[in-house]
């Protein structure tokens, strides 16, 4: 048997000045907020008989906070939102090996959200173990996303009556390990169909978040990694996505290639990423897409068993790009620090 129990807690205090444009007057209010999040997670796995694995688990999440505007002219505050929510979930996963060639996976999760209710989430799959360390998998599963506090309660177009987004994913994949694991490659084919997607209805005044969007995607993902020797390794992956309905921050094409070197205490890696057709806005009639290339470089030096130095450069080509319309990403960025592992 095996299992684990984990707990986390974090909080934040924020004061934001939205600024003002050239020729405009400074705004009088400042956004303020206090937020917190805590969670508890437990699972236990057991083998009941040969080839079997049964896992039971429970998750609890508490989150929320208080947001308000503070006015400088007279010092008064106006509430924006003061909400706290809880999510409780239990799940069971079952895995059974049938001989040496087939593995069956099935599971179900029930999630209760204090604002939007209860959701059942089933999934299942088959894995066929083929000769030469090859595996063919077929999977189907339900997915969902609960609306956020911001979407329901903070700023127009908030809507407290939003429901979860839902989808079903069908996936067929093939992977293989060759040359004692030095070469690994694989490919994925998938189809996603969903509804209740949260969109902003701009035909009303003020605009309002509603559950009327749809998602229907299909695509291909391929990956390959090769360990040349004890010092060098390379990897690459590519994905193509067809979207019947545009999805925010989703690219039509994504290509990645990277190489890494390590010897003794030293390590260095670099990668190049090409993005084409990334939707930064999906508003009907005003869709926007971005194309860009990102080059990153990272180096590290191990000081001792538990500490290492690192230096990193991101977007070294200083590309101007956005992931969400109106929010430009940084150009070339450099950082460094110390990693400590306990």
Task: Label every PLM stretch briefly.
Residues 34-38, 84-88, 118-120, 166-170, ...:
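Residues that define the transmembrane beta-barrel architecture of outer-membrane proteins
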Residues 9-13, 60-66, 86, 108-114, ...:
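Transmembrane beta-strands of outer-membrane beta-barrel pores
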Residues 127, 171-173, 329-342:
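Outer-membrane beta-barrel "beta-signal"
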Residues 1-116, 127-129, 183-189, 235:
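Face-selective signature of the C-terminal outer-membrane beta-barrel domain
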Residues 97-100, 104, 189-193, 210-280, ...:
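Gram-negative outer-membrane beta-barrel transporters
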Residues 1, 44-48, 86, 95-96, ...:
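Residue-level signature of outer-membrane beta-barrel architecture
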Residues 33, 83-85, 135, 139-194, ...:
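Outer-membrane beta-barrel signature, preferentially recognizing the C-terminal barrel domain
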């Amino acid at each position: 048997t095996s299992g684990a129990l984990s707990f986390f807690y974090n909080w934040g205090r924020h004061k934001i000045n939205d600024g003002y444009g050239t020729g405009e007057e400074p705004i009088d209010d400042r956004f303020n907020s206090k937020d917190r999040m805590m969670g508890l997670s437990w699972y236990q796995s057991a083998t009941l008989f040969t080839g079997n694995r049964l896992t039971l688990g429970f998750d609890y999440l508490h989150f929320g906070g208080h947001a308000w505007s503070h006015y400088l002219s007279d010092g008064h505050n106006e509430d924006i939102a003061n909400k706290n929510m809880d999510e409780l979930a239990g799940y069971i996963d079952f895995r059974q090996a049938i001989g040496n060639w087939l593995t069956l996976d099935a599971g179900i999760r029930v999630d209760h959200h204090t604002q939007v209710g209860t959701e059942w989430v089933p999934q299942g799959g088959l894995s066929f173990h083929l000769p030469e360390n090859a595996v063919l998998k077929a999977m189907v599963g339900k997915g969902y996303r609960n609306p956020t506090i911001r979407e329901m309660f903070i700023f127009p177009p908030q809507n407290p009556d939003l429901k979860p987004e839902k989808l079903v994913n069908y996936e067929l994949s093939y992977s293989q390990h060759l040359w004692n694991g030095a070469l690994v490659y694989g490919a994925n084919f998938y189809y996603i169909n969903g509804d209740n997607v949260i969109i902003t209805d701009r035909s009303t005044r003020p605009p309002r978040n509603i559950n009327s969007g749809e998602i229907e995607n299909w695509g291909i993902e391929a990956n390959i990694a090769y360990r040349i020797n004890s010092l060098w390794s390379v990897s690459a992956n590519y994905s193509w996505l067809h979207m019947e309905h545009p999805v925010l921050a989703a690219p039509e094409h994504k290509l990645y290639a990277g190489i890494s070197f390590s010897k003794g205490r030293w390590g260095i890696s670099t990668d190049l990423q090409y993005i084409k057709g990334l939707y930064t806005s999906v508003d009907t009639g005003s869709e926007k897409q971005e194309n860009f290339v990102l080059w990153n470089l990272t180096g590290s030096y191990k000081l001792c068993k538990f500490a290492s130095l690192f230096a990193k450069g991101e977007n070294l080509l200083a590309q101007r790009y956005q992931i969400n319309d109106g929010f430009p990403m940084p150009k070339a960025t450099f950082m460094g620090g110390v990693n400590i592992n306990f």
